[in-house]
């Protein structure tokens, strides 16, 4: 019988970013209580030797599973030291992988109070609205003009420590294009 391969999307992430994200998740689960119902699985609880941890986030009758890996093949860069993250949405026997932005939106919808477009309608009807969004990572678009005007009236409260964002965990902070200084540009780039 042949080997059967399963391909998964795994974002390469440096280990310090993974450690920070894990500590933010644990803080939100055990200290602040914002992440009620979340489940953290340690590496020694998993039968797979490459799994560093799993965070199970219930979303109604489905759940989001964020798995961190270690001991993977290194990437093209020196700092890609075999650490990675995969994000999976599961409902009963069906599962699919999702990107970090969608994961943040799903978490945002289920767990955090938000001052969103619906707040405008609620305020006009006389209902009490939440004055600010607690989880800014869940927004990936610019709001309507009404929303921006109402949001500008309310000064956002800084949350310490920040909420654990999957997008922030998987962003590529190393390969961002560098800006050149001055009008002459970089000496190495223009051949001088």
Swiss-Prot record:
Region ranges (Interaction with host APOBEC3G): 40-44
GO cellular component: host cell cytoplasm; host cell plasma membrane; membrane; virion component
Record-marked site positions (Cleavage in virion (by viral protease)): 150-151
A GO molecular-function annotation: metal ion binding
Location of the region described as RNA-binding in the Swiss-Prot/TrEMBL record: 75-114
Alphabetical keyword list: AIDS, Host cell membrane, Host cytoplasm, Host membrane, Host-virus interaction, Membrane, Metal-binding, Phosphoprotein, RNA-binding, Ubl conjugation, Ubl conjugation pathway, Virion, Zinc
Protein name, as recorded: Virion infectivity factor
